[in-house]
Amino acid sequence: MALETFVNSEPFTFGVELEIQVVNTHNYDLTKAASDLMRLIQGETFPGNITPEITESMIELSTGICHSHEQAVSELHAIRDVLVKAADQLNVGLAGGGTHAFQQWSDRQIYDAPRFQYISELYGYLAKQFTVFGQHVHIGCPDPDSALFLLHSMSRFIPHFIALSASSPFVQNVDTGFHSARLNSVFAFPLSGRAPFVLTWDSFEEYFTKMVNTGVVNSMKDFYWDIRPKPGYGTIEVRVMDTPLSVDRAAAIACYIQTLARYLLTDRPLKLSEDDYLVYTFNRFEACRFGLEGTCVNPQTGERRTIAEDILDTLDRIAPHAAALGSRAALDEIGALANARVNDASWLRTVFKQEKSLNETVRQQCLRWRE
């Protein structure tokens, strides 16, 4: 199969995708209701899209093409409200969060769609374990070479996105010690990790053709990279975030990525090299394990600082681009999180400490989702 033609898109437009937990309202375990939700929303009018995901216990919402923080917030609220209304009719709950706190993966049912059945057959139990919930952000790129430049420039900031969005401290009734345990499920897939270091679309097409010829992949969907190009949309897709507990937090993180993209592609402050990835896996682990308190190592200078400190320094550098995009309010929220060194994982642990019940913790997640 040939690689799709890269469709040039308006630079720095963006779209947001959120995978959502579907839970019962008895003990707040995951439940099988995605098909029923899809039937109930037929005929409803809303921006963007709502689609099923790999198991019956999750559903995905996505915005249209957004230009601003204000538009993203408006669209996410509108789509969220349609889903909440349908969930109320079914007496089920919806929640953000990168993992469900106590579900058993073996109870999951694969959604009846050809691609999901194919993934289940290929990956076995990993497919059911993949009932984890992420936020993806697409960023519009003017041409394919710019997309690859942005992809590799953005990789330096992957720890920021993980730490800011982290909302998965609990897995199967256990506090994992991680801020984002969700990504441990993603790492199990053989085509996860980072994209190959190529900087021209011609070289990327050669790589893709070689991979297709091995029989390992059929399309870009088979790559579970942290950031991957999406040629049919004319975007790069940042895929490392946990789904936040609120749509407002999701919009703020998306606009942080949008503003970074404008800075990286307009100012071109980084000279890219393969050595940028020397500490990539270490930095990513630190963000997953320790959140905003994790260590971030600069691959060029060897300088070490906390991820929170690196975010605050980055916010200063990209401030002019935030003003140009109208994203100051979003970046103020990001700055507040970095200054306080708290994220949704912190909130979940606080609730559990107070309530001493993961069932009650998930119930409060459902309330947060409605805010």
Swiss-Prot record:
E.C. number: 6.3.2.2
Top-level lineage group: Bacteria
Chemical reaction(s) catalysed: L-cysteine + L-glutamate + ATP = gamma-L-glutamyl-L-cysteine + ADP + phosphate + H(+)
Keywords from the named record: ATP-binding, Ligase, Nucleotide-binding
Transmembrane segments: none
Biological process, per Gene Ontology: modified amino acid biosynthetic process
InterPro entries in UniProt: GCL_type2/YbdK_subfam, GCS2, Gln_synth/guanido_kin_cat_dom, YbdK
A GO MF label: glutamate-cysteine ligase activity
Ligase in keyword set: yes
Class of this enzyme: ligase
Family: Belongs to the glutamate--cysteine ligase type 2 family. YbdK subfamily.
NCBIfam families: gshA_cyan_rel (TIGR02050), PRK13516.1 (NF010040)
Physiological role: ATP-dependent carboxylate-amine ligase which exhibits weak glutamate--cysteine ligase activity.
Protein name: Putative glutamate--cysteine ligase 2
Organism, scientific name: Burkholderia lata (strain ATCC 17760 / DSM 23089 / LMG 22485 / NCIMB 9086 / R18194 / 383)
